[in-house]
Amino acid sequence: HALGVSGIELHNLHDPVFARTGSPRDPYAAGQIKHDLFCKGLEIPCIDSITELLDDTSAEEKCEEISVCLRTAADLSVPYVRVRAYDHPGAPQAQDDTVLYLLQRLLPVAQAANCELLLETAGPYADTARLRRLLDRLACDGIGVLWDLYAPCMEKAEPPQQTVTNLGAFVRHVHIRDFAPESGTFCLMGEGAVPTQTLIGALESINYAGHICFEWDPTWLPEAADMHLVFAHFRSYMSRYEKKAVQEIYYNKLHTGRRIWPKEVLIRETFPQVLDRVAEEFPDQIAFKYTT
């Protein structure tokens, strides 16, 4: 939270770390976890299931793993659970039928959990026209889309505005990461070829107001072992795309002058922050004048 993030996403609830008492999977700890997150100004917008909808695992195993995520989402009041299908051999129609069958089996569990299943734009569904056709076959309010900004744009060379045209009404949550084609590796945000500004513009065109979740695997850049620095870099990079809120300006009693902060109130800002704000509000005036 000190880094300025507003949410955290849970991935792989079957990791041993989640088997402990007091972990997010512990239903008896849910109330305390929600209280602690609220006090820190954080929320959990999404839980990521790890099941591959198109692999050779049985339908029962797939549904059980995702159902665990849905039950945990219900306990923690999480609105979304991500499901994914990566590339596997098979005819497209047969693959779509398999995914459709699994989602239809899971829908009653999701509805009971008051949670929405989000199919990620990854694997065969990085082709968002294909994903849209699948969603049209489902014709259900309980299924939305997790837009992985990287996959359609970089893997399928699909313009972001085309993704919006295909899926705009279904987008509930967003993942982002950057990629360096020269080295063929993922990299820190802003150091690769992902057109972040264009993607953010596409999100703004559909009035997206949800979270943008940064994906990072420490093995992608072993020399950047300090995750605090990685996330701080992401937060700093993304701050340029934030819309600054309109901030109140205070007038003096005669309305002959204006001040940025209320009179005789201690402000929690550093000197550089004060200087930046004064320069922003009064760009044509001297912010600080030193005399000798």
PLM region spans:
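Histidine-acidic metal/acid-base catalytic patches
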Residues: 1-6, 31-34, 38, 77, ...
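Short, conserved active-site loops that position catalytic residues or coordinate cofactors/metal ions
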Residues: 3, 8-17, 45-50
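Glycine-rich, proline-tolerant flexible connector loops at the mouths of alpha/beta enzymes
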Residues: 9-34, 86-91, 184
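Conserved beta-strand positions in the central sheet of alpha/beta enzyme cores
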Residues: 9, 46-48, 82, 118, ...
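N-lobe entry segment of adenylate-forming
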Residues: 239, 246-292
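Short, solvent-exposed loop/turn segments at secondary-structure boundaries
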Residues: 20-24, 56-61, 92-97, 156-158, ...
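Active-site acidic/histidine proton-transfer and metal-coordination neighborhood
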Residues: 31-32, 36-46, 52-145, 154
